[in-house]
Amino acid sequence: MPRLEQIALAEAHGRILDVGAGSGCHSLALMKMGKDSLAIDISPLSVQVMLERGVPARQVNFYDPGFEEKFDTVLMLMNGTGIIGNLDNIGRFFDRLKSVLAPGGCVLMDSSDLRYLFEEEDGSIMIDLADEYYGQVDFQMQYKEDLGDTFDWLYLDFNTLAYYAEENGFKA
């Protein structure tokens, strides 16, 4: 597990929500540390795998208003900002965080800055500022001939994250 993720798991405290947990690797590590966590994912197969591994897990969309539990730590690792989708959704994302965080709670998430994809040979960065934010991408999963639907995914650079966090009452 990458060092950054190990640090996040060590810092996670209280009741922990592991968002977009996938196979549950972070929740498994939290369990081994004796920490109280709940893993959520929208994929029924991911939830099935987690349950088979002994991870407390539920099939839940993070944005589902019916999911009303409170957590001391919200964990969003492995490019956790992706579920924001695009910058148009960022206010909704922070509102949702406010609704699931217990008083004094924290969010531990990571993201990749895709700026390196726009680096020129001389080291300069060539980004079209008139275009949409460079970290917004469209994904489509494929297995053999089976194509999934496309979906939005957001990679945030730290400065953009810090700006929107402050605009929404958080600190990065």
Mark where each language-model region is.
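Conserved SAM/SAH-binding loop
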Residues: 23
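SAM-dependent methyltransferase
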Residues: 103-160
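Conserved SAM-binding strand-loop segment of SAM-dependent methyltransferases
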Residues: 54-64
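A short glycine-rich, Lys/Arg-flanked "PGG" loop and its adjoining helix->strand segment in the class I
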Residues: 91-103
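A short SAM/SAH-binding and catalytic strip from SAM-dependent methyltransferases
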Residues: 71-91
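Conserved alpha-helix/loop element of class I SAM-dependent methyltransferases that forms part
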Residues: 1-15
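Conserved SAM/SAH-binding beta-strand->alpha-helix loop
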Residues: 43-44
